[in-house]
Amino acid sequence: MSLDAFLALLVYALVTSITPGPNNLMLLASGVNFGIVRTVPHMLGISMGFLVLLLAVGLGLGAVLTAFPALHTALKIAGGAYLLYLAWKIAMSRTLTGKGETKARPMRFIEAAAFQWVNPKAWVMAITAMAVYANAEHPFLSVVLIAVAFTVVNLPSVSVWAGFGTALRGFLSDPVRLKWFNIAMGVLLAATLWPMLK
């Protein structure tokens, strides 16, 4: 991969990793509701889960989904259902941790990693990266370089969202503001399904 192509890949990785989507909206809400320290496993799960998804797509999973459209459809339905469930949980959350009794908890590492497999934006990012930046002459090396680019860019990008959420904790310590923030985050998370439904 040429230096120009690798730099373009880094820009693609940055833009797709830092723009709003299911992961970043959930991290914003998690930062608000649980703080940055308790959100770290969620952030790491996103980064590692996406890395595994990216490698799987680069090593042939994307071709399998193209060959079996029913599997792709089933994955979209499962992902959509799980995304709606998460949106509901966020929308119904009413208490900041440390501010009273709550059963709410941040997403665990393994849950965040597994979510990447049903996250529509993650699939689009992975398939597009491999289709555009993978080199047919050096397939394995180009897949590894794409994975490295996303690994370098993804964790700092998603951390921005969790950090911003944590910065909002003081403002959202008012229960009414927190209620409406969580409802808005739940609705926005559900709205990320719209491109998948087209």
Regions found by a protein language model. Give the residues of each.
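Short loop-to-helix capping motifs
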Residues: 21, 35, 119-120, 174-175
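Juxtamembrane transmembrane-helix termini in multi-pass membrane transport proteins
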Residues: 3-73, 125-146, 151, 162
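Flexible cytoplasmic inter-helical loops of multi-pass small-molecule transporters
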Residues: 92-107
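A short amphipathic helical element positioned immediately N-terminal to and/or at the very start
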Residues: 109-117
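Hydrophobic alpha-helical transmembrane segments in multi-pass integral membrane proteins
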Residues: 54-58, 117-127, 187-198
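Selective transmembrane alpha-helices of multi-pass membrane proteins
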Residues: 66-95, 154-157, 161, 171-198
